[in-house]
């Protein structure tokens, strides 16, 4: 083996994270590295504890997926210390500006902009955005793309943004807040959140997509099998 590489990811309940883990582990294995999956759960091993364990084991590098590196209000000294120790690190899904590391992410801003433009093309005028905490880089980028498209395509229409959690329950809560504002199109920050929005729409006696259009984000493998498929 060329060395141990740690893969630190959030909980596995969101299907997008097992997808990340599988793809990254396959790439590491094919390059001769030994992947070590480190999952974070409430009350479980923390990111800092995983970092110390990996450093003690002489890890050849650490990959962080959707972790504290994306929190603009968080403490980033842990990543600076890794660099000082000579441990290579890579971040995936957003990087706070103060972190100096190889960073990879989808274009959240462009995705949100395209989603809004699509809804506008369908005739929607009151379009809502359901995203996670705004201190996180991906949420900031999605908000920027949403606002850009709204200002360009619907300059007289107010913004309708709900900041919630990237969970099914968070999506359902967002729907309960956006529907009374008259939103007929809702862009979501994740697929799991979108499923919650759909349930919230139905709980309000409305139909998807006949009454309300919903767009998710992640391209999770099970999403095409939902009713309706996202």
How should each PLM-predicted stretch be described?
Residues 45, 71-73, 198:
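Short gly/ser/thr-rich secondary-structure transition/capping motifs
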Residues 1-61, 68, 137, 144-147:
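Amphipathic helical "hinge" segments at domain boundaries
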Residues 18, 47-48, 73-75, 101:
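Short, conserved acidic/polar surface loops in the N-terminal third of protein domains
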Residues 7-9, 66, 131-132, 207:
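Short glycine-centered, acidic/aromatic-flanked micro-motifs in structured strand/loop junctions
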Residues 26-31, 55-58, 76-230:
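Bacterial carbohydrate/catabolite-sensing allosteric modules
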Residues 1, 13, 71, 166-167, ...:
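Residue-level signature of the cytosolic catalytic core of signaling kinases
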Residues 65-81:
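Short, flexible, glycine-rich and Lys/Arg-enriched loop motifs at helix boundaries
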Residues 39-42, 66-70, 105-107, 166:
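Short, flexible loop segments at the rims of nucleotide/cofactor-binding pockets, characterized by
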């Amino acid at each position: 083996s060329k060395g141990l590489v740690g893969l630190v990811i959030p909980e596995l309940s969101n299907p997008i994270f097992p997808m990340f883990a599988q793809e990254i582990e396959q790439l590491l294995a094919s390059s001769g590295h030994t992947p070590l999956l480190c999952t974070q759960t409430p009350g479980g091993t923390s990111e800092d504890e995983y970092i110390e364990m990996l450093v003690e084991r002489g890890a050849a590098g650490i990959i962080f997926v959707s972790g504290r590196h994306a929190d603009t209000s968080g403490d980033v000294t842990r990543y600076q210390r890794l660099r000082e120790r000579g441990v290579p690190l890579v971040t995936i899904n957003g990087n706070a500006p103060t972190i100096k590391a190889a960073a990879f992410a989808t274009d959240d801003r462009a995705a949100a902009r395209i989603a809004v433009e699509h809804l506008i093309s369908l005739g929607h005028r009151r379009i809502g955005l359901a995203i996670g905490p705004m201190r996180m880089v991906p949420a900031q980028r999605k908000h920027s793309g949403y606002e850009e498209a709204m200002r360009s395509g619907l300059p007289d229409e107010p913004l309708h943004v709900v900041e919630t959690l990237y969970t099914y329950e968070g999506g359902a809560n967002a729907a309960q807040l956006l529907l009374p504002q008259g939103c007929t199109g809702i862009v979501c920050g994740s697929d799991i959140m979108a499923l919650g929005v759909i349930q919230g729409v139905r709980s309000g006696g409305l139909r998807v997509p006949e009454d309300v259009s919903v767009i998710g984000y992640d391209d999770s493998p099970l999403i095409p099998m939902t009713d309706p498929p996202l």
